[in-house]
Amino acid sequence: MTRLYLATAYAQQVVPNLDSPENEKTAQMAIDGFEQVLKKNPNEVTPIKQIAALYFDLQKFDLAKQWQMKVLQAQPKDAEAAYTIGVIDWTVAYKNATKALNSVGLQDNGEGNPKMPKKICNEIKTENTDLVNEGMQYLQQAVNLRPNYDDAMQYLNLMYRRKADFACGNKAEIQADLAQAQDWVNKAMDARKANEAKANSRVTQGVVMGK
């Protein structure tokens, strides 16, 4: 347990998205510690989750996704792991799309980017099709596991907006994807309201119980 506590202490010092040698060194010390724990206890999920989170904080998305997959292997019903894989896929797809659009002086409009040249559309389709398909699969899995998972629903909205890029300006296809996106926005809002009502109910019950 001492090794786990030490690795956790290092992990708590890591600053998300900070690209510096010191931050990376601290993260690597934490990762090394968690991997030592896994050598003795291969089925312990906590260090697997910690390593996945550290790679995400370092923006090493391929490694973060690999470790989240390991979380799901150990705990197939872990909704947060499935959600995080979807977030990673969207993040990479978004970066790919904005980079391609910026190369021809365009900004992402989040609605299929109908003004982009065919060449750029094909480039985005090539880079992002697998990411969007996989991301949707895991985000849907997260919602299936946790029906009121409003964050996962919001990312499904964002994923459909990335999928709309693949229409290459076809208005009907773009509108179909944007309709799906809006549907997930509505579902997310309903889920959030339900979650807030449930949380408020617990607080109220706690106050009554405490009297």
Annotate the PLM regions.
Residues Y83, D150-M159:
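Amphipathic alpha-helical protein-interaction segments enriched in hydrophobic
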